[in-house]
């Protein structure tokens, strides 16, 4: 009975979120409290303890540091430079848009932020070059998605955090997150390539010409921000990759065990503030609080579901009713009619 109530609560949280436009995570927190305390006899402190503190801290810390690159215009300036260098090869413009969006999202801007400032640029390029709006839109969307899935970017961090919370080792979580990133990098390239080289509109772009004025050079704050961002990405990725390649090396194993992307990002945020690379209030406001509340709120409700045995029942039902090859398809359909960040906690728990 309790399992049915928990499933009903998850469905109700989604439905109420869509209907009222209120963050689904807030409804999930309310249902977690009501079901946990009054339905299962848990104490309020036990329910509060289900808040995924580590995931919250990591996402907050990383997004806070990366927000400096958004606030001081580093990412927008970088996008202008990358696209400018493709002006003499118009047929490759969709790939330039894709890789530009990928790089910027991988540097921490996140999916929606990249869409917000890359979409107008891409629309202007489509008007000037005759590039299909469909191809341009696909390039921006795919690039933002791929970059956000990078291991040290927003969605990549969420993937890794949820997997480690589900009991997967840090190394395996890193490898799995790398596979997710690579799949969302390679498949879009094949799709965009087919549109560019196999369609009439794509072949017509080869003869088109568009003018682009040289963008201004990066200022002091933007250069330092770019350097710090690349340095943090290198530090965060070097340790786990080295440990995977040399698992028997004691020194590398020790260093890797002390690495935490959230704590490292916190140090870099302090450095950025000391160097006055951006306004603290604006950087704090750029943190995706809505996404954080949604993920953590749903995480609390999923923890209640695990406590009630709902996830075990759901996993057994899926294992006995759906062929393994169709499981990704089923969850893909669920994600298509829901929020990705809502579907993720459930999938990782199952």
Show where each model-derived region lies.
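Membrane-core helix-loop-helix motifs of multi-pass transport proteins
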Residues: 123-218
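Alpha-helical transmembrane segments of multi-pass membrane proteins
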Residues: 90-105, 129-146, 169-177, 325-337, ...
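Membrane-interface interhelical connector segments
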Residues: 313-324
